[in-house]
């Protein structure tokens, strides 16, 4: 038999349960680290290290990826992002729900200059691009405007965007046709991107929205992530049985679609989600003009009340936390 040659490492993490992210079952092993790299996994009980970490009773895994954040609002103020790192999250993605920085290359440079701690990825937001080309108008783009939007998606992808995000529930994404989204998704797909969507509706029209999301993936040939899948409104609870069946059927016929969800029975968004989309058409100035009209304000108020009772408001104003 050969004598064991003792090795020395910077760090050895021992006695932990390893979950490696591959989908395989956990297993017990030691991990050796030199510099910033894992160099060996196995029984390292005879080896030495400058630092030993005993992971007895703990799980050792790669850093978690948070696929849906709005960390952009605070990343430059708190670049270490301890709230994520202390939970094991080492990669954050932004640009979700159709809103993103643009141009993307300028944003990445700002991130590098700030030296933020986690890994960072950006989706290019459909709503951001639409706003820059069309504004908050409720209409289709002209052929020239659509080409301009496609060029902007291509530019973002060439500068490192992960794909295209939409927030079809929010203005101005809500004013976009399915075909518009398909055309832009085709551009992202050419560059290896994915499509991630806050769908058009997650309440009474949930099933229509799931079908639309699947259709976008099929027509544009792009992998699809159906983000924070949920069923809003008590009367709609149970619809997830149908929505999940649709996703399973789409996957069975070859559509690359996945979903994520958050593990609590609440949602959070901006308060303008309670304001009807037609009232937001044309931008903030136009919305304020409508609110100044007593008749229109009364109509808006009625719709806000309905949304609180049957949609985003959780059924009762007591369930809203501002």
Give the role of each language-model region.
Residues 4-12, 18-63:
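Histidine-rich, glycine-flanked metal-binding segment
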Residues 16, 31, 36, 57, ...:
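Divalent metal-coordination and catalytic microenvironments
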Residues 123-124, 128, 132-143, 147-170, ...:
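Active-site neighborhoods of metal-dependent hydrolases
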Residues 47, 52-115, 179:
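Metal-associated gating/positioning segment near the N- to mid-region
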Residues 66, 91-94, 119-122, 196, ...:
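Structural recognition of the beta-strand scaffold that forms the well-ordered cores
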Residues 97-219:
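Hydrophobic, small-residue-rich alpha-helical packing segments that form membrane-like cores
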């Amino acid at each position: 038999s050969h004598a064991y040659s003792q090795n020395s490492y910077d760090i050895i993490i021992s006695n932990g349960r390893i979950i490696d992210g591959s989908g395989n079952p956990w297993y017990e092993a030691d991990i050796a680290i030199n510099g910033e790299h894992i160099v060996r996994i196995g029984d390292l009980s005879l080896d030495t290290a400058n630092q030993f970490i005993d992971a007895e009773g703990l799980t050792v895994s790669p850093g978690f990826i948070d696929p849906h954040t709005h960390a952009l609002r605070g990343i430059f103020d708190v670049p270490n992002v301890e709230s994520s790192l202390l939970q094991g999250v080492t990669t954050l993605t932004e640009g979700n729900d159709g809103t993103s920085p643009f141009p993307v290359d300028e944003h990445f440079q700002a991130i590098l200059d700030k030296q933020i701690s986690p890994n960072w990825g950006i989706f290019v937001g459909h709503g951001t691009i639409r706003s820059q080309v069309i504004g908050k108008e409720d209409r289709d783009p002209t052929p020239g405007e659509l080409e301009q939007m496609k060029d902007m998606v291509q530019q973002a992808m060439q500068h490192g965007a992960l794909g295209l995000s939409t927030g079809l529930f929010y203005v101005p994404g809500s004013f976009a046709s399915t075909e518009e989204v398909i055309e832009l998704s085709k551009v992202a797909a050419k560059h290896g991107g994915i499509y991630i969507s806050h769908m058009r509706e997650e309440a009474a029209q949930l099933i229509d929205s799931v079908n639309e999301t699947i259709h976008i993936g099929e027509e544009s040939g792009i992998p699809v992530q159906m983000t924070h899948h949920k069923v809003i409104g008590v009367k709609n609870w149970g619809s997830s049985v149908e929505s999940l069946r649709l996703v399973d059927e789409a996957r069975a016929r070859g559509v690359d679609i996945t979903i994520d969800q958050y593990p609590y029975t609440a949602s959070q968004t901006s308060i303008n989600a309670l304001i009807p989309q037609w009232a937001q058409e044309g931008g903030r100035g136009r919305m304020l003009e409508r609110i100044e009209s007593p008749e229109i304000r009364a109509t808006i108020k009625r719709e806000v009340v309905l949304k609180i009772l049957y949609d985003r408001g959780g059924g009762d104003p007591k369930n809203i936390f501002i």
